[in-house]
Amino acid sequence: MKIGILSQFPELYSTRRLVAACESRGHEAVVINTLNCYMNINSIKPSIHYQGQELTGFDAIIPRIHASVTFYGCAVVRQFEMMGVFAANDSISIARSRDKLRALQLLSRKGIGMPVTGFANKPNDIPDLINMVGGAPLVIKLLEGTQGIGVVLAETKTAAESVIEAFLGLKANIMVQEYIKESNGSDIRCFVVGDKVVASMKRQGPEGDFRSNLHLGGCGEKVKITPEERKMAVAAVKAMGLVVAGVDILRSNRGPLILEVNSAPGIEGIEQTTGISVTEPIVEYIEKMVLARKSNRAVIA
């Protein structure tokens, strides 16, 4: 097969590991900078062009769309889909998961546990918003933030009111969440491919920081997840419509709670922490799906 890896960063560990996994299974891997793609959108033969050449002959793509280019990245993935190319994560699911509020609403609809979350637009609703999530301490998140950036822990009601008011004054979209104190600055990252959790690790934030992101200095360690956590992680990915995703889970006194579903999860941290390859299952899943599509076409023909 010819597999395209949509990534702006060919030198990244994640990109290199995906290339290696494709090649080790006998496939041709092509790294494509998403932002360098341009499209011919028409009703007869839609196409994608790259560095002056039309991109043809691809069986599948693995989107690694950075949050900062979600709109353009999803357009490129959608164009590949229009050309009949299988996408490991499709454009609709990527866009769905990138909208943090929409993602939580989808989880809510499926009855999947999550921290109590509030969303408002008017400053005069702030006191009720704070009470809605159980009061201070609470977590305030920019909807556009990634990798722990734009996440604030407000220890008191006064601090919470000040931060929320400041964000709203800047016309920033924010959500307010209950603070799960018992998680103690840690979470569980589950790496899901299809309907399986292929690897999981516990991430612990640095001393004095409630955020556990490895990019912010957190550390990871192997962890054994419970059957409930495993089932919840897979259900959360399915709720988004994704195939490959990282699911962040908080362990609370009322059971596991989904914090976030990431459509382009980091690979380096979880592979080096667990010693498990998460890239091979991705390629194996693509092989299965592309073969099934070809078989269906043959039957129809």
UniProtKB/Swiss-Prot annotation:
Sequence positions that bind ATP: 141, 178-179, 187, 211-213
Record's cofactor remark: Binds 2 magnesium or manganese ions per subunit.
Binding site for Mn(2+) 1: 248, 260
Gene Ontology MF term list: ATP binding; metal ion binding; ribosomal S6-glutamic acid ligase activity
Family, similarity comment: Belongs to the RimK family.
GO biological process: protein modification process; SOS response; translation
Top-rank EC class of the record's enzyme: ligase
Cofactor: Mg(2+); Mn(2+)
Pfam family, one: Rimk_N
InterPro entries linked: ATP-grasp (IPR011761), ATP-grasp_RimK-type (IPR013651), ATP_grasp_subdomain_1 (IPR013815), RimK (IPR023533), Rimk_N (IPR041107), Rp_bS6_RimK/Lys_biosynth_LsyX (IPR004666)
KW Protein biosynthesis (keyword) present: yes
Binding-site residues, Mg(2+) 1: 248, 260
Residue sites binding Mn(2+) 2 per the record: 260, 262
Enzyme Commission number(s) of this protein: 6.3.2.-
Keywords: ATP-binding, Ligase, Magnesium, Manganese, Metal-binding, Nucleotide-binding, Protein biosynthesis
Name of the protein in question: Probable alpha-L-glutamate ligase 1
Gene: rimK1
Binding site for Mg(2+) 2: 260, 262
Domain spans labelled ATP-grasp: 104-287
Gene Ontology annotations for the cellular component aspect, listed alphabetically: cytoplasm
